[in-house]
C-alpha cells in the first residue's frame, strides 16, 4: 500500500549540529488514502526521503511544522505530533508517540514510549511504557567508562520529568524521576522516587543506585541538594532528604531516614 506521496514543492531547512551549520531539502507528505485518523488529501510533516516514513502501518507525521530527515526512520503505528524534529538516524517504531520533541543521533524509541516537550539524543534505547516529558533531556554518550558498550536505557514504566539523564544511566521498573540529574552509570529502578523541585535538583552519578521503595528528595532551602556518588545506594524504604551527600560504599536501607544536613557519609575502605 502506498499511503502518501511527497509534494512537488520543496523547502530548505537549516540547522546546527555539533556547532556545524547544515541544511537539508525537504518535501511535505500528503496522504493518498484514508487510514487510522488520517484522511486522503491531508498534508503532514516534511521529510527528505521516502525511506524516512514507512508506507506500511498507521505511522504518520501529523503537524505541518514537524520534520524528519537524515536517515531517521518512522515505522509501525508511531505518531509524530506538533513541531517535532526526528533526525540523524533516530528510529521511531511500534506505538511510540513523539509530541513536540527532538529525537536524534541514533536514538531508538520503541513499544509504547511517549516523549513530550523533551530532547533525546545519542545512542540510547527507550522502550516499554516509559514516559519522558516536561523539558527533560536524555543525552547518551558511550565510551566514558569500562563498560563502553552499555547503552543509556529508560524502560518498563519509568517516568522522567524536568530532568537530565545522560551518559549510560539506567532508569527502569516503576521509577519516578522529577527535577533530577542522573549521569554516568547510575541506576534508578523498582518503585524508587527521585524528587527534586524548581529550586534544587537531586544529583545521582557514578555507579550510585536508588531502588526498592526508596525516596531521595531535594529541599527548597539553599544547598538542599541530595547527592549520591560513587557506589552509594539508597534502598528498601529509606528516605534521604535535603543537604545529604553519600559517597563510597554507603548503603542506606531499611526504614532509615536521613534529613536536613549538611550531612556526609563516606566509607572509602569497607571492611
Task: List the predicted regions and their residue ranges.
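Extended, highly charged clamp/arch subdomains and adjacent linkers
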Residues: 84
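Intrinsically disordered, low-complexity Ser/Thr- and acidic-rich flexible linkers and loops
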Residues: 144-149, 219-225
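Short, flexible active-site-proximal loops enriched in glycine and acidic residues
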Residues: 73
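Terminal amphipathic alpha-helical/low-complexity segments used for targeting or macromolecular assembly
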Residues: 1-58, 64, 77, 88-89, ...
Amino acid at each position: 500500500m502506498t499511503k502518501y506521496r511527497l509534494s512537488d514543492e520543496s523547502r530548505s531547512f537549516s540547522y546546527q549540529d555539533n556547532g556545524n551549520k547544515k541544511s537539508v531539502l525537504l518535501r511535505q507528505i500528503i496522504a493518498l488514502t484514508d487510514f487510522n485518523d488520517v484522511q486522503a488529501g491531508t498534508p503532514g510533516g516534511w521529510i527528505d526521503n521516502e525511506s524516512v516514513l514507512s508506507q506500511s502501518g498507521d505511522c504518520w507525521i501529523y503537524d505541518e511544522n514537524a520534520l524528519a530527515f537524515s536517515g531517521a526512520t518512522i515505522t509501525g503505528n508511531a505518531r509524530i505530533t506538533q513541531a517535532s524534529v526526528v533526525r540523524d538516524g533516530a528510529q521511531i517504531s511500534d506505538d511510540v508517540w513523539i509530541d513536540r520533541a527532538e529525537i536524534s543521533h541514533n536514538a531508538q524509541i520503541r513499544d509504547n514510549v511517549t516523549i513530550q516537550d523533551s530532547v533525546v539524543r545519542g545512542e540510547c534505547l527507550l522502550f516499554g511504557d516509559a514516559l519522558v516529558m516536561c523539558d527533560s533531556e536524555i543525552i547518551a554518550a558511550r565510551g566514558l567508562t569500562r563498560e563502553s558498550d552499555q547503552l543509556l536505557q529508560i524502560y518498563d514504566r519509568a517516568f522522567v520529568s524536568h530532568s537530565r539523564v545522560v551518559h549510560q544511566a539506567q532508569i527502569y521498573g516503576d521509577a519516578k524521576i522529577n527535577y533530577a540529574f542522573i549521569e554516568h552509570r547510575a541506576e534508578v529502578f523498582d518503585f524508587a522516587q527521585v524528587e527534586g523541585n524548581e529550586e534544587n535538583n537531586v544529583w545521582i552519578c557514578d555507579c550510585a543506585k536508588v531502588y526498592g521503595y526508596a525516596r531521595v528528595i531535594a529541599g527548597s532551602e539553599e544547598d538542599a541538594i541530595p547527592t549520591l556518588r560513587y557506589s552509594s545506594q539508597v534502598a528498601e524504604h529509606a528516605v534521604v532528604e535535603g543537604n545529604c551527600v553519600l559517597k563510597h560504599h554507603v548503603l542506606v536501607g531499611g526504614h532509615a531516614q536521613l534529613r536536613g544536613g549538611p550531612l556526609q557519609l563516606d566509607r572509602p575502605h569497607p571492611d
